[in-house]
Amino acid sequence: MSLASRRKVRIRLYGTNPADVEQVAREIVDLAKKMGVQVRGPIPLPTRRLIVTVRRAPSGQGYHTFDHWEMRISKRLIDIEASERVLRRLMTIRVPDTVKIELQLI
């Protein structure tokens, strides 16, 4: 294959369910290895914690009680040196609704 037909692709996966993110990352790496392309990853990135504190009593009267809500966002990074054929196969992977994917050509 010529160098022009191969490109480096950076895949960012993120989602609120860490098991789903890990499963999709594993499927991408398995597919890339099966097709014989060079792959780096999945590289775990720091988990982001979003915390929202809300007051329980809407009127402002009574005790000062608060609820704390938290959402964790797990992230993985995968680098693949892939051809157009591999990228087309990547598009066939079933991705749960809780996982978002960003593709970036480097």
From Swiss-Prot:
One Gene Ontology term, aspect cellular component: cytosolic small ribosomal subunit
Domain of life: Archaea
Entries under Gene3D superfamilies matching the protein: Ribosomal protein S10 domain
UniProt-listed Pfam families: Ribosomal_S10
GO biological process: translation
This protein's record includes keyword ATP-binding: no
Single GO MF annotation: tRNA binding
Keyword Secreted: no
Keyword list, A-Z: Ribonucleoprotein, Ribosomal protein
Cited function: Involved in the binding of tRNA to the ribosomes.
Entries under PANTHER family matching the protein: 30S RIBOSOMAL PROTEIN S10 FAMILY MEMBER
Annotated family: Belongs to the universal ribosomal protein uS10 family.
Assembly mode: Part of the 30S ribosomal subunit.
Protein name: Small ribosomal subunit protein uS10
Organism in which the protein naturally occurs: Pyrobaculum aerophilum (strain ATCC 51768 / DSM 7523 / JCM 9630 / CIP 104966 / NBRC 100827 / IM2)
Upper lineage: Archaea, Thermoproteota, Thermoprotei, Thermoproteales, Thermoproteaceae
